[in-house]
Amino acid sequence: MKAFPKNYNFTENEKKWQRIWQEKQIYAYDPNISKEETYIVDTPPPTVSGQLHIGHVYSYTQTDFIVRFQRMIGKNIFYPMGFDDNGLPTERLVEKQKQIKAYNIGRNKFIQICEEVVASEEEKFRGLLNKIALSVDWSLEYQTISPLSQKISQMSFLDLVKRGEIYRNDQPILWDPVDGTALAQADIKDTENSSLMNYITFKTEQGEPLTIATTRPELLPACVAVFYHPDDRHYKHLAGKFVITPLFKDKVPLLADPLVQQDKGTGLVMCCTFGDQTDITWWKTHNLPLKTIITKKGTIDFPNDIGIDRLKIKEARAKIIDILKEQNLLIKQEEITHIVKCAERSGSPLEILTMPQWFVKTISHKEALLKRANELNWHPKNMKIRLENWINAISWDWCISRQRCFGVPFPVWYSKRVGEEGKILYADIAQLPVDPLRDLPIGYSRDEVEPDLDVMDTWATSSVSPQLSTHGISDDFAINKNRHDKLFPMDLRPQAHEIIRTWAFYTILKAHLHQNTLPWKNIMVSGWCLAEDRSKMSKSKGNVLVPEKLLEQYGSDVIRYWSANSKLGADTAYSEDVMKNGKRLVNKLWNAAKFVSIHLHKLKDQDKKAKLLEVKEIITNEFDKWMINKLVELVNAVTNELQNYEYANAMHLTEKFFLAVFCDNYLEISKTRAYDEDNKNLSGQYSSILTLYHVMQTLLKLFAPFMPHITEELYQILYNDKESIHIKGTFANHDNLHYNIDTKQAEGMLKILDIVRKFKAEKNLSIKAPIKLLKISGIVLSEELAEDLKNVTSAEEIKFEIQDNKIKIDIII
């Protein structure tokens, strides 16, 4: 055994072991092992959109607990790390960091700067993820913007085109005027805004005044109809008539439709193209004309005498209201709060514009996707309802076109040849990856085609994150079909709950469309990390925790301990108290191991090398046997919890056993036998030391998935093993090990010890204070247990009296 160091220096040791683990490649995936023996993880690729925060550490380490356990029970592990480094989030980071805009410096220059920023940020990400001891195989790393990922993403696009699941259409889409791009339904958030409900006078052709309430009077030039509910008796007489819009004098039909809310406003609603999704429905259902007045920049495009042309939306609204007031057409205004659809990232209110975009069919697959959600194993189970609610709420097909620069291009051109103008030309699979701005379709020259200038939604690539690692999409579209078949579907998708509607949903959708399957067997959903006061962390509040500072203060194992104390899926507040508990646990492990180390030289080498089951008969003491039985129960319970992804329960059971059973009781009770300074009980001494040896070894293995550095250090010191504690097949397994003993005896002794300890505490006596006599009734302990009790309580004499079955004690000091 190595000499036991005086103190544990977590800073030095964590760096040391991280280096050794990488050098020895103990986390390497073996492609020669079968899929059945491999545990395959679809690791969340962190978005390169800013600094990694404590929430990332929180969720990534929770995944690592499960992965390390699976490796230790003998599984070959496929655990990659990726970086989601394309799309709007990354562009926004670059624009903020470099104080530039893509449209000011040109597409190519902007992409070059994005690539430079991404490379720098990813190096920082790697450093932090290594510091928190993620057991990923870095040789499997991928970037969503790499040529390989672009090829796979474009293969996904072409496969879905071939299957008829992707289409291009000129139809209404959600538009973010700040970021200048189309968005999908999942990219929006409902924001409560204060606004004014404006009651405006319209007139029928016959001159009958009608009042219509609207929050968006600037859309009056785009009004194409006025609607009322077919059951509304106030307006039934208007059927078939026309109304004249104020200011702009347009003649529009009065129509009945059941979607009108009779109790909202006046019961009359103007339909404009477009103010909301109901407008789109009415426009389609009633075959109404299209009037487009809002530009991509969020300004009005409507030259007229009113003077709203080129004004921003809010400016045009104010101008229209002023004119309505001047002409006595504004009856009243009411202050209201209502929900406005905004872009999740820019926060800008969205507009609905009509333009050609690419869409993935989604609405037609809702029923099938609900079935998929039910087939998936959810951890925790209550997260499934979030996906079900989202699927039920879907009302748009997935728009995957983005009018940005730094993303995966569509492998598409549009023909300019005479006779086939506008024909869509797709890249050949052998050409991928392609950039239509640089490359050409087979058989066409530059002047014969128009490239598709858009890039794909970043989720269009992230949604094939399993396939970015497997290198295949389907039977017809695969770079390495054998690799793909060996890795897909995967075993686990870990992710946060707020992206169930995006990442989880889109990945399930793609796998369903490509191969009629789920992408993984299990999904493990983490909660949020909150500030200590349980508020959401934000830079504006100044309560964001920087992982590097916490690592410097506490070390990786303590942070991982804090993460392990949170149940899966629960939102958890950062806690200094839990961190301090973790620090105490590290120290306690160190000190317990130091005590064990003192005695190990007394063991025979052959007994050290043997498995616990093989030395079962050498453990002769009754309390040692009880301890081994309890240890086996613990191993079985912890194994069961980890197999069910309940890492918090596993950690709690292990910690409780270590502190309460092993440290507080077993170490104290067996200590005298272990030392045996008078050589009175050599077999009892050997039994206790062998028990200490194996219990400590097992506990280190149970703690190893959670606290990898301290367990590795102690494992190497105590057991001088040439192999890491973290390699495949090292988890504790004591099957078929059990001693047939009367457990009531040992448990009775512990009850007596507890009573004695409380007595000494109440009398302010030292725990080692001598006792003249212990008179015990209700139980008669065996000679071995009585001797252990005598030693641990410092009792000179113990007398047993049988009176009844209830344990009672008289203590004479």
Swiss-Prot record:
Question: Keywords in UniProt for this one?
Answer: Aminoacyl-tRNA synthetase, ATP-binding, Cytoplasm, Ligase, Nucleotide-binding, Protein biosynthesis
Where in or outside the cell?
Cytoplasm
Its transmembrane ranges are none
Where would I look for the motif 'HIGH' region in this sequence?
A: 46-56
Reactions this protein catalyses: tRNA(Val) + L-valine + ATP = L-valyl-tRNA(Val) + AMP + diphosphate
Keyword Transport attached:
no
Classification via InterPro entries: aa-tRNA-synth_I_CS, aa-tRNA-synth_Ia, Anticodon_Ia_Val, M/V/L/I-tRNA-synth_anticd-bd, Rossmann-like_a/b/a_fold, tRNAsynth_Ia_anticodon-bd, Val/Leu/Ile-tRNA-synth_edit, Valine-tRNA_ligase_type_2
Q: What is known of its domains?
A: ValRS has two distinct active sites: one for aminoacylation and one for editing. The misactivated threonine is translocated from the active site to the editing site.
Q: Into which family does the record put it?
A: Belongs to the class-I aminoacyl-tRNA synthetase family. ValS type 2 subfamily.
**Function, in words:** Catalyzes the attachment of valine to tRNA(Val). As ValRS can inadvertently accommodate and process structurally similar amino acids such as threonine, to avoid such errors, it has a 'posttransfer' editing activity that hydrolyzes mischarged Thr-tRNA(Val) in a tRNA-dependent manner.
Q: What is this protein called?
A: Valine--tRNA ligase
Organism expressing this protein natively: Rickettsia canadensis (strain McKiel)
